[in-house]
Amino acid sequence: RDPEMSRGLGDVYKRQNLYNPEFYLLAYANIAKSQGSMTQGVDGQTLDNMSLPRINRIIESIRNRTYQPKPAKRKYIPKKNGKLRPLGITSTDDKLVQEVVRMILEAIYEPTFSNNSHGFRPKRSCHTALTQVKKNFTGVTWIVEGDIKACFDNFDHHVLVELLRKRISDEAFIGLIWKFLKAGYMEQWQYNCTYSGVPQGSGISPICANIYLSELDNYMQEYKEKYDCEPERRRTTREYERASRRYRKARKALMGAEKSTPELVKEFKDSRREKMSQHYYNPFEEGFKKIQYNRYADDFVIGVIGSKKDAEKIKEDVKIFLQEKLHLEMSEEKTKVTHSSKPVRYLGYDFKVIHSKNMKRCKNGDMKRVWYGKVFLYMPKEKWIKKAMERGAIQVKRNNDTGKEMWRPMPRKDLMNRSDAEIVSTFNSEIRGLYNFYRIAENVGALHKYYYMVRYSMLKTLAGKHRTNVSVIKKRHMVNGVLRIPYDTTKGRKYCEFYHDGFRKHSDGYDNVADVMPSYRKYDSRHTIVNRIKAGVCEICGEHADYLCMHHVRTLKSLKGRDIFEQKMLKMRRKSLAIIRYFITNFFLTFPSK
């Protein structure tokens, strides 16, 4: 490409994206939706008081290359295994710039990512990953469970930058990403440098992780092309051919007989059952090999149609590739080879390949062996029990005589200070959250046991709050078997109903396109936060002004209506207000100078 042309295209890209205030407003609208935007970084600022002058100052500092990210504030959150996961809370200005960088990187790399990658990508989730496993892993005999040790903490910065340079020629943009990688973090008021990894909690860490691990995706695609081997014509097994001849003979005899006899019917059914119980193809046929691959963030699984020796070799080859090319290490404890008939834990589900030869009668009356070789997804029993115990909804004790577990619903004292409608709403959201995650599991109906326990926990919580018993609560609020709690609004009395929609299994994890809000409803609105700040109209007094800023609160629930800001927010049912400097000065709100 001509250098002058490349430089010209780079200038256009910078004007349209990196130096464009409209792009920053779009990024601001994205991060404003998150409650994390109101979390303070090391500078003590939040998204509150965002304005166009503040955005223009950020753009100018990026243009003249004086922009310097602040170190992240380190916090620790508990992991499932009892250990702690470090999170980096970045400053508000850094969150905004990182969102801009994320959108640019996503536009460049998203079309090139593998279809087998599902983590941190638009319109993809754990459900799409599991649905792909269910569809593509049919008939696999061995499964390689892959886990990368401390993946996000061990990304090599130099390797990441070299990967970025393959697609991006703008060194200033890469330099900006390098600054974020080297920004460091504050812990116990002490600054610490970062020599590797991308901080979890950073706006660019998910896209950087996918760019880094897409090399593994590409490697597995090349490996699959070399490994897969399928003969032009696969031979049927001798057992199946023999059973087929017996079935055809029995069927011909039954159809040709003037009158069916019990012996002919029995022979026909037995021969059909024998035929359906045999393999059509030999699953261990010499020369027939295939692998399937699926990744979500740093977790991946590889399905192998082949021998255990093949699976062990694939595991070792992947380990060597990660060490030599990406400078990452696989966890020896968590990375293992498992037979497909045994449950494999992946993304909170258990899955295994069914080897049952049982048959099922279809709608047209034919008998089919519908399960053999299929992948089934299961909800682990301990998951919903653990959730209920963590929330204090049940108490599990073991009977000393029989050794059996005794489950007892318990009132939740942490919810008793809330209103009745809030208590029911909290239980509803917890039930729906668990069901929505496990809705594609074969045994999702097992949540009825969870529902029974949680329902009585909710009734006991209401009874404990009102110092009565469960029978009184039922008699007071139960209507046609559904518990309804009344609450008053400005439009009259309404009712909050306890969840009663059941736990129907969904066929796959892909959302219905019909449920997606049309773009003209989603974006083309004068009430969006971007249009409100650009309109230049103060939402307190209605005056036009060039200098508007956005005032934010974390939740509407925390507002008491003590001043004009809170009264207006409660009236508009919004967590943000576009206001002018006059009100900021008079109400002692901090605001950055022009």
Label every model-predicted segment.
Residues 2-13:
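Single conserved hydrophobic/aromatic residue that forms the stacking wall/gate
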Residues 31, 60-83, 92, 96-104, ...:
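Reverse-transcriptase-like RNA-dependent polymerase core
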Residues 115-116, 121, 128-321, 325-329, ...:
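Conserved polymerase palm-domain catalytic core
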Residues 305-314, 323-325, 345-536, 575:
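Active-site and adjacent loop segments of nucleotide-processing enzymes
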Residues 538-541, 580:
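Short cysteine-rich clusters marking metal-coordination/redox-active sites
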Residues 542-543, 584:
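Cys/His-coordinated zinc-binding microdomains
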Residues 544-576, 592-594:
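Histidine-centered nuclease catalytic patch
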